[in-house]
């Protein structure tokens, strides 16, 4: 593994940068120094939540004191005095000032937060509920302490009093916890939807999906489909979980450290040291796990893709009787995933060994420190249970990394996969994660929008290759001057069409063409979308551009008069690539030309599955339509429908000749 590759699997600044670039846009635009503003907004939101929680706590305490004065006089005197002291202190004024300042921060960013208020509102509600849940946990720790002390002292009145309080707290807590969990998942779903649409927008922009094709030798971005589906779902859910877990840990740490400090300072400091030790060891082990989890995601995706390929090419495999080879290839992918998974479970076992020892040993520490204090009469019996609870809560907060290291390493792997994907989508289309240069220095073919298709001194090469397909080619295809491109297989005929479409730009020279909306490309194997027959016909238009009569007339024109009736109408939904023969699919593709009526149609052996008579009828119909066509083909009969012929020869040579019909 190279040093650059090793850096992909470390807890470092690059990992943080990729995380921010992926996570921040949902809440705040990404830009120079914008991350600081984003983090400042989160801090301001926390200030708002803390201030509102403070006022709510004081108000509820005063309200409860007014309703149950006898109870608070006997059992909650310290609480009432503390709240009263808080009210008389500068704290309320500080809270009001903090609220005003935090509000001003959000108001100052209102333009950049447009259409983002819902996520901030949900996040604020979640933080508020998190504060409430932590407050209820603190209350329960004291309730348990009083219950245990009452049982030990056989004080029935206090026992039943606090048992009723426990019941009330549970009744209040259950709907709050349910609401918290629901909103947590809801925000995760909304975030996933937004982030997926954000990635899809970039994936389809500038034909990035083509340049990032995982079948290409020129990209290191494997399985973009998995990154958009599984990795984004994992990223949004786990990010939200970790964010709230970290905040929960901070609140728990503050709340229960104070309780622990009042019981035993020795216990508190020993706990902090123990947690730091566990975190350091967990991170050291986890760094190795990031790479293993990254590989597991990649290998599982490759295995799944192998099965998808078999499903999509079942008929071809059956004709070739290639079941044995296909099974071997799919099994090899499975074994690759299994080998890596075996390595993964070894490391997971090592982490589990450390985690179990770490967690079991922690149960001894409170008793070792607290028992002598109780036996000496310095603590009441209920303090033992409260100390154990507080110790466990604080340890859980401090040991977040230790206990979640396996999830964190899986999360880091997802961050790296999404980060690489995001960086590639933002890069120039001809620089998308390609391997190192082969040593052949390419220029770039220039594309110019014009009224015709014309090539000026075009030299074309495959991406990252020194092979010359066509050298210094100049030609013009004026309206009606149909062009036929012929030549031996592998000579570069289809590559020339890719250059005209703007898919390939390795080489030099200038290509003039109309806007892509005025061009329609028909490959040899037509693309059948997942949609109705109507949607097949109007593709690539998203909305219907013709009425039913015109669509049916077009089907008749391409010699498919009974197709709609055969499948139950234009709105029938089928797996068209399976139920239609290749010849029928090619005629559907030609129907798209008659429906969309482009100025130029480029046919890459688009009639190869048709008989000569069908081919002749369709070319005559295209001529009557007024669309200028550029065809790639091998049949000599194609010359009857074109005005000029470009013959692509070996070593970049070519010849243009007129066709006299």
Swiss-Prot record:
Instruction: Using the UniProt record, give the first listed, main subcellular location.
Output: membrane
- What would you give as a GO molecular function for this chain, any one? ATP binding
Q: Which GO terms describe its cellular component?
A: plasma membrane
Q: How does it sit in the membrane?
A: Multi-pass membrane protein
Which residues hold ATP?
487-494
Q: Where in the cell is it found?
A: Cell inner membrane
Domain ABC transmembrane type-1: from-to ranges: 123-410
Q: Which domain of life is it from?
A: Bacteria
Instruction: Report the transmembrane regions from the record.
Output: 37-57, 87-107, 120-140, 158-178, 243-263, 266-286, 341-361
Q: Does the entry feature the keyword Signal, yes or no?
A: no
SMART domains according to UniProt: AAA
Q: Where is the ABC transporter domain?
A: 453-659
Q: Which family does it belong to?
A: Belongs to the ABC transporter superfamily.
According to UniProt, the name of this protein is Uncharacterized ABC transporter ATP-binding protein sll0182
Which species is this UniProt entry from?
Answer: Synechocystis sp. (strain ATCC 27184 / PCC 6803 / Kazusa)
């Amino acid at each position: 593994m190279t040093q650059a590759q090793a850096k992909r699997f470390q807890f470092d600044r690059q990992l943080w940068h990729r995380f921010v670039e992926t996570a921040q846009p949902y809440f705040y635009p990404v830009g120079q120094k914008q991350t600081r503003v984003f983090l400042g907004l989160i801090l301001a939101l926390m200030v708002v939540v803390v201030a509102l929680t403070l006022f709510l706590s004081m108000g509820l305490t005063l309200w409860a004191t007014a309703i149950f004065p006898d109870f608070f006089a006997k059992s909650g005197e310290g609480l009432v005095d503390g709240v009263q002291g808080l009210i008389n202190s500068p704290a309320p004024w500080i809270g009001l000032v903090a609220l005003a300042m935090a509000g001003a921060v959000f108001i100052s960013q209102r333009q950049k937060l447009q259409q983002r208020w819902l996520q901030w509102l949900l996040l604020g509600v979640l933080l508020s509920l998190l504060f409430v849940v932590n407050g209820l946990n603190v209350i329960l720790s004291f309730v348990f302490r009083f219950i245990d002390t009452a049982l030990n002292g056989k004080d029935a009145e206090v026992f039943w009093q606090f048992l009723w309080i426990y019941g009330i707290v549970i009744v209040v807590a259950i709907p709050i916890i349910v609401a918290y969990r629901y909103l947590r998942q809801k925000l995760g779903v909304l975030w996933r939807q937004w982030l997926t649409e954000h990635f899809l927008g970039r994936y389809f922009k500038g034909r990035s999906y083509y340049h990032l094709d995982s079948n290409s030798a020129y990209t290191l971005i494997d399985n973009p489909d998995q990154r958009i589906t599984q990795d984004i779902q994992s990223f949004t859910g786990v990010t939200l979980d970790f964010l709230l877990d970290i905040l929960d840990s901070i609140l728990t740490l503050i709340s229960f450290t104070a309780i622990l400090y009042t019981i035993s300072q020795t216990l508190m400091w020993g706990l902090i040291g123990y947690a730091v030790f566990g975190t350091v060891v967990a991170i050291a082990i986890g760094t190795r796990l990031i790479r293993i989890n990254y590989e597991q995601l990649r290998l599982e995706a490759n295995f799944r893709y192998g099965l998808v390929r078999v499903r999509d090419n079942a008929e071809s495999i059956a004709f070739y009787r290639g079941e044995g080879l296909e099974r071997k290839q799919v099994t090899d992918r499975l074994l690759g995933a299994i080998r890596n998974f075996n390595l993964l479970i070894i490391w997971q076992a090592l982490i589990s060994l450390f985690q179990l020892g770490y967690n079991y040993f922690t149960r001894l520490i409170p008793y070792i420190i607290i028992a002598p204090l109780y036996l000496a009469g310095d603590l009441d019996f209920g303090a033992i249970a409260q100390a154990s609870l507080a110790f466990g809560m604080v340890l859980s907060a401090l040991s977040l990394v230790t206990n979640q290291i396996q999830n964190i390493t899986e999360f880091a792997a997802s961050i790296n996969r999404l980060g690489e994907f995001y960086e590639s989508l933002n890069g120039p289309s001809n620089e998308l994660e390609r391997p190192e240069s082969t040593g052949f220095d390419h220029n770039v073919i220039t594309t110019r929008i014009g009224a015709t298709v014309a090539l000026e001194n075009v030299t074309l090469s495959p991406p990252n290759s020194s092979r010359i397909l066509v050298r210094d080619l100049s030609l013009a295809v004026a309206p009606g001057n149909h062009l036929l491109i012929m030549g031996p297989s592998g000579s570069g005929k289809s590559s020339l069409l890719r250059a005209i479409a703007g898919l390939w730009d390795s080489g030099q020279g200038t290509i003039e063409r109309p806007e892509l909306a005025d061009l329609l490309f028909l490959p040899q194997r037509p693309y059948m979308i997942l949609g109705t027959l109507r949607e097949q016909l109007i593709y690539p238009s998203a909305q219907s551009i013709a009425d039913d009569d015109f669509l049916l007339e077009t089907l008749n024109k391409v010699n498919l008069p009974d197709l709609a009736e055969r499948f139950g109408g234009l709105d029938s939904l089928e797996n068209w690539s399976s139920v239609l023969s290749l010849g029928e699919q090619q005629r559907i593709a030609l129907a798209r030309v008659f429906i969309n009526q482009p100025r130029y149609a480029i046919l890459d052996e688009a009639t190869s599955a048709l008989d000569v008579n069908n081919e002749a009828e369709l070319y005559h119909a295209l001529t009557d339509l007024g669309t200028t066509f550029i065809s790639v083909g091998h049949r000599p009969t194609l010359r009857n429908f074109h005005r000029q012929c470009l013959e692509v020869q070996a070593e970049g040579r070519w010849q243009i000749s007129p066709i006299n019909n």
